[in-house]
Each structure stands twice: as C-alpha cells, then as structure tokens.
Amino acid sequence: TACFSFYATKNMTTGEGGMVVTDDDEIAAKARLLRSHGEASKYEHVIVGYNFRMTEMAAAIGLVQLKKLEGWVRKRRENAKVLTKGLEGIEGLVPPAEGNWMVHSYYQYIVRAEPGFPLSRDEIVSTLTEEGVGCRPSYPAPLYKQKALRDLKVRGKCPVAEQVIGRLFELPVHPAVGPKDLETIVEAVDRLAKPS
C-alpha cells in the first residue's frame, strides 16, 4: 500500500489531490468509502467520509503527466548530481546523499547547514532569494509537533529531526532548471560560505 500526492509542486501533478494504491482488498474498500462521503451505495453512508473524488479532467491531466514522469525524474536527478558536485567542496554544507540501496526522485533537494556555517538557515534563504535563487526553508517542525498532533504526546521520538530541521533549506532542481541556473546557484551558495 502506498500513497502519492499530486499537489502542484510534486514531481507529477494533477493540480491537487492524490492516489492510493494497494493490493489489500480491505484497505481498498475503506479508501473507496472515505473518498466518497462514506457512501457504500446510493444515499447509504456507513461511515463519515469526505469528497476526495478526482475529476475526469484531473485524471486526464494525470495520465498525460504520467507519460512524462520518467523524463522529469531523470532531469531532476541530473540536476541534483551537478548541484551536489558543486556543493561538495563547500565547508559546512551537507548536500543530500543517495545510498546504493535507493533511487532518489529529488522532489526536494534539501541541504543541511552545519552549526559552524557562517549564516543561519534563514539568512541563507534570505540572501539566496535576494540574489534570485529560488530557495526556501525546509519544513519548520516534525509532523508530530504540528498543532493537530501535539496533544498525542509523541514528543521526542525523532531527536535527530528536531536537532537538524532548523538548519535545512531547499534548492531548485526541477526540470526547468538549466546548466546556467545550476552554475549560478553553486556560485551564490559558495559566496555565502566566504563572507566578506
């Protein structure tokens, strides 16, 4: 069982929404109920559900996007490889790594600034943004620290995430990023590591 988001910034989009795939009949039946107001048959609601039905237009967009996905991921991976090579020599920054057991899709290219880096994450983002580099801070907190989940008392279960999350920022590697853009990004980040 897996879930996929088709939000506008994802590797593949239908504008909004997502998809659940499963080989478990029970999960499939529950997902179908939840997506259509909990309706088991016409006007018979057996659980509280939602309106998660995808429109035919969104599905058609998704089918076209799906044919392009492999090429888009390949381009993201190529861009990430160039960016990683350019950032590897910059002291105090840790680009994302790809283990030999995985294939990264680079939906996001997240860089970690080490505590000794001369600028904070927010200063990095602000400076790069001023220089025209599409940069943003990564997520502000682990999911369990969000208001909706805080009272479930799951605190402290991800100490490494809590330690590094305030030092993570994202750089662009989407398919529209070209070689000159990557060069500009690396040069701008390199200047941050050598403040005047």
Residue ranges and their predicted role:
Residues 23-196:
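PLP-dependent aminotransferase class I/II
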Residues 11-15, 103-105:
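Short glycine-enriched loop/turn motifs at secondary-structure junctions
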